[in-house]
UniProtKB/Swiss-Prot annotation:
It comes from Staphylococcus aureus (strain NCTC 8325 / PS 47). Residues 283-298 have a biased composition (Basic and acidic residues). Residues 283-305 are annotated as: Disordered. This is Lipoyl synthase. Its EC number is 2.8.1.8.
Amino acid sequence: MATKNEEILRKPDWLKIKLNTNENYTGLKKMMREKNLNTVCEEAKCPNIHECWGARRTATFMILGAVCTRACRFCAVKTGLPNELDLNEPERVAESVELMNLKHVVITAVARDDLRDAGSNVYAETVRKVRERNPFTTIEILPSDMGGDYDALETLMASRPDILNHNIETVRRLTPRVRARATYDRTLEFLRRSKELQPDIPTKSSIMVGLGETIEEIYETMDDLRANDVDILTIGQYLQPSRKHLKVQKYYTPLEFGKLRKVAMDKGFKHCQAGPLVRSSYHADEQVNEAAKEKQRQGEAQLNS
């Protein structure tokens, strides 16, 4: 946690973005409030929200409430005692995806360690409801590790998302400090078991940089992900949400991100997005497999007919 006396690194120019609050963005924000829905785009203060909502027709819904049972030191999502589950949430999410005419939707969730099934049944039902109402929209899920409950993971994977995304976030050495309620190896096992359950569904993970890791540790994390058959990798700059969160140790340059992407592709990832403003869901619509891309093309054709 940064104190008033600690030096805060000055944000470089390449992290300064121009906000584009066009009609799509404004309309989506209004609808979210009307439907009483949460998005991680807003809760986690994502820098790409205007591009995704405004231009790419993608959005990331955060289900199972807006309060997380964990308190990861990098994350801006509220923590504390969550509310009861809203059993109508799956239908509202599905309806909103339809009204927004989304090309790709990411469904993430707060960690619900207070629930016996970690929220997996409502999560899976949300995927099914979205699929029923939006057959041409590709669906990516971004769950917590569900406390290592692999029955919950099986429930989730049985809903057949187009991508399973679970973020390792940082290197092994820093994991206890960055996300104390998770473990590095449990994340790897979660990803491995996801692929074993549904081998044709691409798996994906994300690394934040700038927390004090070394380049060698980043490469080791890439190797660990590939050893567990992860297909897609995103790498982005950690940005400190508030003074209460971990402070930034280093700002990586766009050139350094380019080098990281090249190394990732050389290591065998099928797709890698790497850049200062890249987040886990950034350009996620481009990362689905060919079968899912065909679904998107059919949706575009129907939209333009």
